[in-house]
UniProtKB/Swiss-Prot annotation:
This is TATA-binding protein-associated factor MOT1. It comes from Saccharomyces cerevisiae (strain ATCC 204508 / S288c). The gene is MOT1. InterPro entries: ARM-like, ARM-type_fold, Helicase_ATP-bd, Helicase_C-like, Mot1, Mot1_ATP-bd, Mot1_central_dom, P-loop_NTPase. GO terms for cellular component: mitochondrion; nuclear chromosome; nucleus; transcription regulator complex. Belongs to the SNF2/RAD54 helicase family.
């Protein structure tokens, strides 16, 4: 069965295959847009999306639900009684009357049927369940549960269900067997054909499973519902409708008819567009809710045993019910009361089913923090969507059922144990109920019930139940607090007691409980209750007692809990009542400070810091009795100890001293008397959960200082934030305390042997100064003691930066360096044979160690070993060893150098961080020092070299502070130099700012293309990568600093820093009008740098700066875009593009007006190159922001895709490929604000062109200006419209309609029309452009006559010359060429006489069967590509036969460069597509293949048009292909077996040596021998045959002739087939007729046959051995290579016109192309082409327009031979070919071409692999079981892991089940 994938299907498949969620969502949203544009196709769209709701992949189901929601949102609400409300009897149109008549008759039929008890729709509701009958106890007692998978995967049912399982298994086997029989049955007469071994069944099962997994989802029939079935079962319903359909009224303006005007105005072509099979559904289409079918399918799936199907069904119902609950089950013809009742019953039935799922579902997915029950969550959302549409009575019933689910009263359920999953489901239902129907709860007094349920849930032992219970009240706390105080008090008491109990690390519910508590504490009512309780029980209920209960959760293992407790602390701090702040003390400060030091999560680290700052601020405001320094008196020292713990390097960690870590009063241990349990649930995982895992120490790596595990940045960031928090704390201390602390503690940190304390002390001092100055009035100075204490130490080290000691943290790197030095010395001894005594002594102890002395090993020692010592030792080596030892010594020496550089780098980074913070501090407490250089150098070094972003940003802030101080002190020159250096940092990365001197030589090249090829080449260069990394770091530092500078100085920055304006604009303005050739390297680099700086700084500029300084200079930038130097054009293009990303309207308006016209500048290559390069960079930098402007770019790009310059061509096509895929999205984009009016109008004009290009159905109808003698069908007129569109815009294309649809006729129409229009224009204008030019048709030689005949038939007014025949014939024809309108020639002639044909320019150059030029390297392809023509057109039924590369060759003829160079195409498309064909490729490679295929499809989409016969010809009879098997004859069998035995080993060896040409040749010869033998033994028995004598003996013994028909079973089979067709019947009954003395002869046979063979010899045997000997009455003709190509059309014509000719004998090569042989209705292949496309084309000679009979195709195949195997494979290939070639194009609406490429789709290839495996032996079949999957696992491990279906990560669950987001969708 062939896979059929239209463009719409491709769009739908993106729901599953999209590489990111953004892509998948976009695909889903486009489904909604399609539904909006084509509401009549809503059901069709839904049927395609529906299967994706039920797949295994989570994200696919969710995206499919989104698509369903988008589709149904655009369907009108269904109210069949709407007209009941409208009075009046206005007369309508005949169509309206017809509809009224249909409805009236329908009503009568309904009433009649009801009276006869045949149809009573109301009584059909008996299967619906009601809430009154919903009994929880019965449901739970039934024993039925819904787990993760069905009973086929797990034995979950009791003994009672054994029979069901057995029956299911039996049905499975029956189904598989029947499938096997149907597909593999070769010959009905062979009794053993249906007998299948167990192995075959197992293989079939696997194959079925694989194909199920790999084939695209087929649309599902969602139109059929119980209601529509009931309606259709009414008597005479169809007849009634049929009679109505044929009534006169229904023919008026009938939308089911296509009417096509013809050139001859007296004719109209009228065609039916609706197939009869669809008529039946249309009878009831307007009588039933259109979604009834899908609604019922989803209802059935809601109770599926597979959780994925349940989940998908719930999602689908949710989307359906949101808008369309009102329409469920309503039927036209019922009264409103009846419909209301039906609707109410159906919705009640849905509610009861949802509740049942709550009760029975047991599936849960454990994600990090909690369990998520996706089925129950989605069912709860569906219930919420349903509740909006239900009345009060049903809502109360649902609430009561949910309450039963939660409480599970044992008296009611009769079960001793409660089922927590049912409770969980009930709570989820109530959670959504509460959010949706808040007012309803108050109106019916249900809020107290809700509270009771919440309290019940909170008191359960299951975390998941507690978590949902807590979340129920969170959205309605403001309503809840209005209840009586006792209820609030109970809840608050419960929550605090829970927090006291939930003290283990796996309590996932803590976060939800804390969120609820935080919300409650926002309300004064709750605070009042807490105050009152505090007065009564101060020790228990004051905030001072309550808040410490939260402390243990600060370091909880679950991040959401840590976040919740921090948010709760902020909530408590924001309470306005001062009396609630009595819990602020030293302990909470210290615990939160520890949180900062220990937190690895960046978001929570920042939140911890914010909480700490809030604590300080509130303490300062509220507490006056105790100063902050008093509070910190006991905590300052321990905090500083922890903060100053050194941060080591890999190989040496420094752990925090645990005695300084304060633990909260409540520890992490479980109470010995109770242990909590995780909720037991069914999950896909069998991973055991270890016991006693309650405490997880998440802080262990941080406490241990584990650099390897955490990375340097994670640890450093916590210390930097800690230092900032510490500094902030100190800024609130009293001066006396500060002075003492600075003198006795902090200043000593500056002299510690570790670098970390020194750096952090620097940060503390600088941040302290900054905080202190912010807290005090402007102008007030820092206390003098700060400068006195720190200034001497810091200044000394800044002035003597080289006098730093070697820090202890550097010891590991020095030890590693020493090891490399020792290794070098050892190499001298081991390889260089140097005596030990000649080696220098290297100290064992390294600098930095505690015992290190003055002679300890350091970097200096290593440098001596590397240089001085190395040279001495090498000289002293024996000469005989020098050569041998040179390579090992150089390697070892290089490793020493690498280690030296590494050690220096580490030391430099650490000293740099220290000095930068010292410099920052001195600037703050001393102001500008006299010696600025040490300060500037330290800060700038940190900006350009610091790897930690926080430290780099702090250095940048200090540089900006320095610039401010310099400006205040009028030191403009110094500040200007700093800014100049910062701008220099932006230009060091040559990937961003090119090097002028290197690129100045390029003038007629596009630099973008050069840089891209260079970047690919440089990827593997390690040195370049390191330099690039350093340049990027420097650029990043410059950007950070300049961004801060722009923020601080604002719009006045260019006034305050004139040097910056100069850097930005002066060099551009100075050289604006200067010739590029006169610019020297220095000036050129300045210009390039200006562009680079402008690009980088533009995003930081204010709007006023942009308007006044940048937009006014666009003309200056434009001069450089037009420069003759590539580097200037590149810089200007990138600058424009980056500016457009920020200010799109201004830049794009200028681009459209001033720059796009340059793309058509024929006289200036630099204009075309610059403008094309700009568009390329616009598409890259703007990404989807370019959407509103895409419409302006397409046409100029199309023009440049055929540019004479290769670089322009390549870049234009690359750009076109990237933006063409955005065109479908452009239509929905509003005009950008501020876009000038004339551009808005222009956009509409451009859109008209684009719409025609992307959707030929929008192509303007082309009325033929001349009378073509043919009647065009609708689709043919559409094709001509498309060809006319291509003609108008000078585009070229491929018309690849299915064979037999009239490609020739459509081509004649456009050629003849254009010829006429050009002639008309020439007569008016005498323009050279419209002078008369002939058109050239190049086709296979057998079709030259066919084209001549077609032109004579349809356009006889055109003079046609067939330039074909031998050289002498062609010589006589050459004089006629100059006068011809049409020249028809063959490919061979075109190649041989290219010089003759090239003398003429052509209007059209048409390649018929254009796939012949698929090999781009062939002389033929190269020849036709040299022909000059205004328009190029390829006609082919099969544009791709084997390889996607063939498509490149076709487009290289049409538009050279459109698909890039062949090499580029290979890299971008062919390789990834080919790689994805291998079933063993990774999922990443598979996706790359799919994306490449999709990208290629989108790029070629506008230039290929394909329609299929079955889609455009409703009157074309079917084509039936059958295999006809025959056994080998005895002689053939003997020869075949002898050959295979002897040749098998030889062939095997040849296959091993298949790279050798001779080996390949031998294999081919062997295959050809076997192939010929299968046809006839005479074809192989040459005089040289080794067994000739044996054969002759055999023939003598049997008395047979070699050419006897007994020796040729294929001829016997052919005779039998012909007899069955009624051909040659006279020969059977000849004897009988002679006896009766009168002849039995039919002049015309019932059937006529085309008989195809590969070889002319085989045709001879059919003619001589069969027809002449055994079937002399058969009349026949022959068409093979011996017939002159010019005479072949005569043979065709005679055969078609003379029905008494029974058979036409053809060779596939000659008769398989382009010919119209509709006179035959039977096609018989005696021999077969190994390329299935050729056979496919051959059989379509008969199956084409004009054929009135069913076409039967017979393939005669010899059983048990190579032929059968090859044909089995070919049969598979034909399936793929069918996928590729016979794909529907959805008419012209999608102009689809991807089906032509689907041969390269991974899905199809997998099928091929399976087919080949099934042909293998049992070992191969067995091996299938154990192929490693993408995880690398096989066997049972693979199966086990395979059960773990892919779910989303927690963040995606949060997104899908976010209550607030969901509620918004309902409103």
């Amino acid at each position: 069965m062939t896979s059929r994938v239209s463009r719409l299907d491709r769009q739908v498949i993106l729901i599953e295959t999209g590489s990111t969620q953004v892509v998948r969502n976009m695909a889903a949203d486009q489904m909604g847009d399609l539904a909006k544009q084509h509401p009549e196709d809503i059901l069709s769209l839904l049927s395609r999306v529906y299967p994706f709701l039920l797949v295994k992949k989570w994200e696919t189901r969710v995206t499919a639900a989104r698509a369903v929601g988008g589709i149904v949102a655009h369907a009108p609400s269904w109210d069949p009684n709407e007209s009941d409300l409208v009075g009046g009897t206005n007369e309508g149109s005949p169509l309206d009357n017809a509809q009224v008549k249909l409805e009236h008759e329908m009503k009568i039929k309904l009433e009649e049927a009801t009276q006869n008890n045949q149809l009573n729709l109301l009584q059909e509701d008996h299967h619906l369940s009601s809430l009154s009958d919903w009994k929880l106890n019965e449901i739970l007692k039934s024993g039925k549960v819904l787990l993760a998978s069905s009973m086929n995967d797990y034995n979950v049912l009791g003994k009672a269900d054994d029979n069901i399982r057995k029956q299911a298994k039996t049905d499975d086997i029956k189904q598989e067997t029947s499938m096997l029989n149907a597909s593999d049955k070769a010959n009905e007469n062979k009794s053993n054909a249906n007998k299948k071994s167990a192995r075959m069944l197992a293989m079939a099962r696997r194959k079925k499973k694989m194909s199920a997994k790999n084939t695209p989802k087929h649309p599902v029939d969602i139109t059929e519902s119980s209601v529509s079935k009931t309606l259709l079962n009414g008597k005479n319903m169809t007849n009634s409708a049929a009679s109505l359909a044929t009534s006169p009224t229904s023919n008026q303006l009938n939308p089911k008819l296509e009417i096509t005007e013809q050139a001859d105005e007296s004719k109209l072509m009228i065609e039916s567009t609706v197939r009869p099979l669809l008529e039946q559904h249309e009878i009831v289409a307007g009588l039933v809710w259109q979604f009834q079918g899908i609604y019922e399918l989803l209802l059935d799936n809601l109770m599926s045993e597979n959780w994925e199907i349940r989940h998908g069904a719930a999602l689908g119902l949710r989307e359906l019910v949101k808008k369309h609950a009102y329409g469920v089950s309503r039927v036209k013809g019922n009264t409103r009361e009846e419909n209301n009742l039906r609707n109410s019953r159906s919705l009640e039935d849905l509610a009861s089913r949802l509740l049942t799922v709550f009760a029975l579902d047991r599936f849960g997915d454990y994600v990090y923090d909690t369990v998520v029950a996706p089925v129950r969550e989605s069912v709860a959302q569906t219930l919420a969507a349903l509740l909006i549409h239900l009345d009060s009575t049903l809502s109360i019933k649902i609430f009561n059922c949910l309450e039963q689910l939660v409480l599970q009263d044992p008296l009611q359920t009769g079960l001793p144990n409660k089922i927590w999953e049912a409770t969980h489901g009930g709570l989820l239902g109530i959670r959504y109920f509460v959010s949706i129907k808040t007012n309803f709860l108050f109106a019916h007094g249900l809020l107290e019930n809700v509270v009771r349920i919440v309290l019940y849930g909170l008191n359960q032992s299951d975390d998941d139940v507690q978590s949902v219970a807590a979340s129920i009240l969170t959205p309605i706390t403001s309503e809840f607090v209005k209840l009586n105080n006792s209820t609030i008090e109970i809840l608050v008491t419960t929550i605090w007691s829970l927090l006291a109990r939930l003290d283990d690390d796996i309590s996932s519910s803590v976060g939800s409980i804390m969120d609820l508590l935080a919300k409650l504490c926002d309300h004064q009512e709750v605070l009042d209750i807490l105050k009152n309780k505090a007065l009564e029980h101060p020790s228990e209920w004051s905030f001072k007692s309550l808040v410490p209960k939260l402390y243990p959760f600060l370091r909880h293992s679950i991040s959401s809990v840590r976040r919740a407790v921090l948010n709760l602390l902020i909530a408590f701090l924001s309470i306005k009542d001062d009396s609630t702040k009595n819990w602020l003390n030293g302990k909470v400060f210290r615990l939160v400070f520890q949180n900062i030091l220990l937190e690895q999560n960046p978001e929570l680290l920042q939140l911890s810091f914010d909480v700490y700052v809030a604590l300080l601020e509130h303490y300062k405001v509220k507490h006056t009795e105790k100063t902050l320094d008093h509070v910190f008196s006991k905590h300052l020292q321990p905090i500083l100890h922890l903060l100053n713990t050194p941060v080591g390097e890999k190989g040496k960690n420094y752990a925090m001293e645990s005695q300084y870590i304060l633990k909260p009063s409540q520890h992490y241990q479980l109470h010995p008397e109770k242990k909590r349990s995780i909720s037991e649930t069914t999950t896909d995982s069998d991973i055991p959960i270890p016991k006693n895992n309650e405490h997880i120490n998440i802080d262990a790596p941080m406490i241990a200082g584990d650099i390897t595990l955490l990375g340097l940045d994670v640890i450093l960031n916590t210390r930097i934030m800690g230092a900032k928090a510490f500094a902030l704390t100190l800024s609130m201390f009293q001066d006396s305390t500060l002075q003492s602390f600075f003198t006795n503690v902090l200043v000593r940190c500056l002299e510690l042997p570790f670098s970390t304390p020194r750096m952090l002390a620097g940060i503390i001092v600088s941040q302290f100064c900054s905080s202190w100055l912010q807290k005090h009035p402007e102008g007030e100075k820092l206390p003098s003691f700060v400068s006195e204490i720190f200034s001497p130490v810091m200044n000394k080290q800044l002035l003597n930066r080289d006098e730093f000691p070697v820090f202890r943290e550097l010891v590991p790197s020095l030890k590693a360096l020493r090891t490399q030095c020792q290794s070098l010395l050892a190499t001298f001894v081991d390889v260089g044979m140097l005596p030990q005594y000649k080696l220098p002594n290297v100290a064992i102890v390294v600098q930095g160690e505690t015992e290190a002395g003055p002679h300890a090993f350091g970097v200096e020692t290593a440098e001596k070993v590397y240089g001085e010592y190395y040279d001495k030792m090498f000289k002293s080596m024996n000469n005989s060893y020098k050569l041998l030892a040179k390579k090992p010594l150089e390697d070892s020496k290089h490793r020493v150098l690498m280690a030296i550089n590494s050690a220096k780098e580490s030391a430099k980074l650490r000293t740099g961080s220290i000095l930068a913070n010292y410099a920052s501090s001195i600037l703050l407490f001393d102001g500008l020092p006299l010696k600025l250089n040490p300060i500037i150098r330290s800060l700038m070094d940190s900006v350009k070299e610091e790897r930690n972003e926080k430290l780099q940003t702090m250095a940048g802030e200090s540089v900006v502070h320095l610039i401010q101080q310099l400006l205040e002190n009028n030191k403009v020159n110094v500040s200007g130099k700093i800014v100049k250096n910062l701008c220099g940092f932006l230009c060091v990365d040559t990937s961003e700012v090119p090097d002028f001197s290197v690129n100045a030589e390029y003038k007629e090249k596009i630099l973008t293309l050069i840089k891209e090829s260079n970047s690919i080449a440089a990827q593997d260069d390690i040195n370049l990568a390191k330099m690039s990394e350093e340049a990027q770091l420097k650029r990043k530092g410059g950007l950070i600093t300049l961004k801060i500078l722009f923020e601080v100085l604002g719009p006045s920055i260019l006034q305050k820093l004139p040097q910056l304006r100069s850097i930005l604009f002066d060099s551009l303005s100075d050289h604006e009008n200067e010739e590029a050739s006169k610019v020297d390297n220095e000036q050129g680099q300045k210009i390039v740098d200006s562009f680079g700086v402008l690009r980088a700084l533009f995003p930081f500029m204010s709007d006023s700066l942009r308007s006044s300084e940048v937009f006014t200079r666009f003309p200056v930038l434009l001069t450089f875009l037009r420069s003759n130097l590539s580097v200037f054009r590149y810089s200007a293009a990138r600058t424009f593009a980056d500016l457009a990303k920020i200010s799109s309207v201004e830049v794009m308006a200028y681009t459209i007006r001033e720059i796009l016209p340059l793309m058509n500048s024929a006289g200036s290559l630099s204009d075309r190159q610059g403008s094309t390069e700009l568009i390329y960079h616009l598409s890259l930098s703007m990404e989807t922001d370019v959407l509103p402007y895409v419409i302006f770019l397409i046409v100029p790009l199309l023009g440049r895709m055929s540019d004479s310059n290769e670089d322009v061509r390549n870049l234009a096509t690359t750009t076109f490929a990237s933006i063409i895929k955005l065109v479908p999205l452009e239509a929905g984009i509003a005009d950008p604000k501020g876009l000038p009016e004339e551009l808005v109008a222009s956009r509409e004009r451009e859109r008209d062109f684009i719409q025609q290009m992307m959707d030929p159905s929008k192509a303007k109808p082309f009325k033929l200006p001349i009378a073509i003698k043919a009647t065009l069908r609708k689709y043919q007129q559409d094709g001509v419209n498309w060809l006319a569109f291509l003609n108008k815009y000078h585009l070229h294309g491929i018309l690849c309609d299915d064979m037999g649809l009239g490609k020739t006729l459509q081509t004649i129409c456009i050629i003849a029309s254009d010829q006429y229009l050009r002639k008309e224009d020439y007569e008016k204008t005498r323009s050279v452009e419209s002078r008369a030019l002939p058109s050239l048709i190049i086709c296979p030689p057998s079709l030259t006559g066919h084209w001549e005949n077609e032109f004579d038939q349809y356009a006889p007014f055109l003079k046609v010359v067939v330039y074909a025949g031998g050289p002498t014939v062609r010589l006589t024809l050459r004089p006629q060429l100059s006068d011809a309108d049409i020249i028809v020639t063959s490919y061979d002639v075109a190649r041989n006489d290219l010089a003759v044909l090239n003398k003429t320019e052509y209007n059209y150059c048409v390649l018929d069967e254009g796939h012949i030029i698929k090999n781009s390297q062939s002389k033929l392809a190269k020849a036709v590509k040299e022909i000059t023509a205004n328009h190029r057109l390829i006609l082919t039924g099969t544009p791709i036969q084997n390889n996607v590369l063939e498509l490149w060759s076709l487009f290289d003829f049409l538009m050279p460069g459109f698909l890039g160079t062949e090499k580029m195409f290979q890299e971008r498309f062919a390789k990834p597509i080919a790689a994805s064909r291998n079933s063993k490729t990774s999922s990443k490679e598979q996706e790359a293949g799919v994306l490449a295929l999709e990208a290629l499809h989108k790029q070629v989409l506008p230039f290929m048009l394909r329609r299929l016969k079955e889609d455009v010809l409703s009157d074309l009879p079917p084509k039936i292909i059958q295999d006809y098997y025959c056994e080998l004859g005895d002689l053939q069998k003997q020869l075949y077996m002898d050959f295979t035995k002897k040749q098998k080993n030889v062939v095997e060896k040849d296959i091993e040596n298949s790279e050798i040409a001779d080996g390949k040749q031998h294999i081919f010869q062997a295959l050809q021998y076997m192939r010929k033998l299968c046809n006839h033994p005479a074809l192989v028995l040459s005089p040289n045959h080794p067994q000739l004598a044996q054969v002759q003996d055999y023939l003598k013994q049997t008395g047979l002739d070699l050419h006897d028909i007994i020796n040729a079973p294929k001829l016997s089979a052919l005779r039998t087939l012909l007899f069955e067709c009624g051909i040659g019947e006279e020969d059977i009954d000849k004897k009988a007729s002679q006896d009766q003395n009168f002849p039995i002869q039919n002049v015309i046979s019932q059937h006529r046959a085309l008989i195809f063979c590969q070889l002319k010899d085989m045709l001879d045997m059919v003619e001589n051995d069969l027809f002449k000997k055994y079937m002399p009455s058969v009349t026949y003709m022959r068409l093979d290579g011996s017939i002159d190509p010019r005479d072949r059309q005569k043979v065709v014509r005679k055969f078609n016109e003379d029905p008494s000719i029974d058979c036409l004998l053809l060779t596939t090569k000659v008769g398989g192309l382009g010919l119209n042989l509709t006179g035959a209705d039977t096609v018989i292949f005696v021999e077969h082409d190994w390329n299935p496309m050729n056979d496919l084309q051959a059989m379509d000679r008969a199956h084409r327009i004009g054929q009135k009979k069913v076409v039967n195709v017979y393939r005669i195949i010899t059983k048990g031979t190579l032929e059968e195997k090859i044909m089995g494979l070919q049969k598979f290939k034909m399936n793929i070919a069918s996928t590729v070639v016979n794909q529907q194009n959805s008419g012209l609406a999608s102009m689809d071409t991807h089906q032509l490429l689907d041969l390269f789709d991974p899905d199809n290839v997998t099928s091929q692999d399976n087919e080949e495996k099934n042909n293998g032996d049992s070992q191969a079949a067995k091996g299938m079981e154990d192929i490693a999957n993408e995880t690398g696992l096989t066997g049972k491990a693979k199966e086990a892991l395979g059960e773990l279906k892919e779910l989303w990560d927690p963040s995606q669950y949060e997104e899908e089940y976010n209550l607030d987001t969901f509620i918004k969708t309902l409103r």
